[in-house]
Amino acid sequence: NSMGVKIIFISDGDVLGVISVADPKSNIDIYLGTGGGPEGVLAAAALSCLNSQMQTRLVFQDDDEKNRAKKLGIKGLNIKYNMNDMVKGDVIFCATGVTDGNLVKGIKDVRDYFEAETFVLHKSSNTNKIIKNKIKK
């Protein structure tokens, strides 16, 4: 606190946490954490669409996880990955809220339909929007 630094600990939602860093209105400067590999790729996809950067390393809890990565064809088990190592080319990222969150609202039951919000990013078209959908029951 003496340095004017605010630290927020999150236990879940690492993809949203990473996306928040790219939002100039969030007042968040950096995200540090340990999460799953699939979540890291999703975060990289979103950040790629937002013209942001990230670096990561694989962290294994045990030899089983390391062996699984090898079976998936991952060769660089101990290297630093940049975003371009994780996602390439044109990227689309979509996230639909199931429950209410900071980014989108959760699914609502409204009379004869369900209402859902989806956050959509598309790199090549520079799309960044929230789409509201109505789905008939």
Predicted ranges, named:
Residues 123-125, 133-135:
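Non-transmembrane, aqueous-exposed alpha-helical and coiled segments at domain scale
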Residues 1-113, 117-122:
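An extended, acidic
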